[in-house]
């Protein structure tokens, strides 16, 4: 989960600049994540967090497939077309079935797949994911990289996962997805940052990627606050 960064001079590459911008605006998400991890009713909060994560992650592959289609529809001479489509071609298979992992984790704590799939995602989750479709379909598919940079850029540490496991008392299976993302996302983050550094973006495209990323910080933080708000702390 994200941690706050200190101010510094913006670096030069596209990926490094985006990461710098994200680090500067992470405060709301850091605070929401800390409130989740340290919530006195974590046994009730954690399953809701897994459900919310499932609602978000089950949309990732369809969203990236849409972005790939839109990238391939760009003019052949567009300098973003081929590297963006190639990146998504490679990354989509890496993200397959992660939503199923979360359903497995929830089953490990007694919550059935059917009950999760019946739940209505919050309006905030719909905004978080739906905004990306707007950027991809009505502006430029490169904007989705800002969203991916946030979701895969701040994996949970082993220590944090151990703390959650200890405080909830849930079986290890309930933390499988968190642990796998903790292992995988650092590599995914580095790959994305390097790819962004190699892109030739217009100033407008660079702005779209940044806005996509930064609005996602606020909406993801709000999604966590929403689920915490369902369970007032007792005592």
Positions of PLM-derived features:
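Non-heme di-metal
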Residues: 1-235
């Amino acid at each position: 989960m994200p941690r706050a960064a200190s101010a510094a001079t913006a670096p030069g590459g596209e990926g490094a600049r985006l990461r710098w911008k994200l680090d500067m605006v992470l405060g709301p998400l850091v605070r929401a994540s800390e409130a989740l991890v340290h919530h006195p009713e974590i046994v009730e909060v954690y399953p809701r967090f897994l459900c919310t994560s499932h609602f978000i992650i089950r949309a990732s592959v369809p969203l990236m497939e849409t972005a790939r289609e839109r990238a391939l529809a760009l003019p052949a001479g567009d300098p973003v077309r081929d590297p963006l489509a190639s990146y998504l071609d490679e990354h989509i298979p890496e993200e397959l079935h992660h939503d199923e992992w979360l359903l497995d984790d929830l089953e490990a704590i007694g919550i059935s797949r059917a009950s999760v799939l019946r739940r209505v995602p919050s309006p905030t989750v719909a905004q978080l994911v739906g905004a990306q479709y707007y950027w991809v379909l009505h502006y430029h598919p490169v904007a989705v990289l800002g969203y991916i940079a946030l979701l895969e850029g701040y994996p949970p540490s082993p220590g944090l996962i151990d703390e959650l496991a200890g405080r909830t008392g849930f079986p290890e299976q309930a933390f499988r997805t968190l642990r796998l993302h903790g292992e995988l996302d650092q590599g995914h983050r580095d790959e994305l940052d390097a790819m962004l550094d190699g892109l030739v973006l217009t100033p407008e495209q660079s702005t779209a990627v940044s806005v996509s990323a930064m609005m996602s910080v606020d909406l993801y933080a709000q999604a966590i606050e929403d689920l915490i708000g369902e369970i007032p702390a007792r005592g």
